[in-house]
Amino acid sequence: VERSVESVFAEYQKELLEEYDIFGLDGSYETGSYTEDRVLDRMTVFGAIAGENQIEAIRFLSDNEGQEFADQVCRYLENLYGIDMIQDLIGREDEAKEQEEKAIDFQKREEENEKKMDEVLASGGSLEESGEGSEGEIENPLGVLQKLKHRVLAEIVLPRDRVISQKSVEGMAGVSGRTRQEGKGNLPSVEANASEKLYLIAYIPDHFKSYTKAEDDRPLEYEQEYLIGGKQNDMENLQIVLNKIRRFRMAPNFLYLQTDETKKAEAKVLAGIVSALLGNPGLTEVVAQGVLMAWAYGESIMDLRVLTAGGKVPSVKTKETWKLSLSGLLKLGTTQDSGSSSAGESGLSYEDYLKMLSLLETKETLRMRMLDLLEWNLKMRLNCPFFQADACITRMRIQSICQLRRGITYQFSTYYAYQ
């Protein structure tokens, strides 16, 4: 029996191992439908006696919200690289949470400012709001901000000649979104790994692609964005990620502007002109803050252009690293906008922000979304249309009952797990 069980597990799904470094036995035997009989029948091919064995306990790759999958990921990376693999991620989760809290707090401030600016704009409808006024007209930065916020962010950020993936897996329920086949019986518990999420994050770059490293043969090209967005099409996931990064960039950009007296003075001059044209010079200070908010928003778009082009953006700006002029803000998103930004060489990259955003997801969410991607890729890219993560066996215990002479029976168990 032991030899037959080992032989069965030796027939692991090779595409799963080659592509994702994960061991698993296809319990459906290329039918797409798991039954215990398929496994037991296969054991008889390797010498087990029919009718003497039954599956006492079993685990599938997706069991316990993907815990079986995560356990293999952790052991694979620990054995291959040791703790060095996650050394640079230690402490990054707390940093990511702190950044998120700042972004949430600043978003409230942004919303309050937006309400004030709506009131200002409503009080002076004659002022040109398009940001593309004709010669001699004063362009309204508040109107520019309104226009930008109503545009699809990806269309403003990404180069005009870059084709954005429109791929979708709608109608193909991933393992995270369907009723799953669950394992049964008692097996040794998977030992908790305090660094599991860090190992999952470290596993991502070598196994899943992103916007900056997309491959067009994949069901979803922006896989890392899917881990964060969870939508079944590339465009939505990319939009979610760009918006999250923009929120992270807004606060430090706005705070820098508050320290730059030259830029504050520029904003105040423009605010004074806008307020005068609105017929209410007393609004200058309020409008100036609105101009600075719009400027920070515009700079955040410039940051996204750098990041998506493969460059880096410093966490905190200086006079030297600030990119967008006030006149450039008024052209942003218009036909006069070049749509590009000079590359940055220091700071955080797009991939760094993806890691930060992934750290904000729960480990359960990451596990199951990884399994979604893994399953879609095996089905659609690696010619395994039958593959189901919840039919992929990782561990099993077989109970055997042998008939001896004189009516004596002998009962024993055989356990096997991919290690």
Tell me the role of every PLM-derived stretch:
Residues 22-419:
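Long, compositionally biased low-complexity segments
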Residues 2-34:
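Alpha-helical assembly-interface signal, strongest on the long, hydrophobic N-terminal helix that forms
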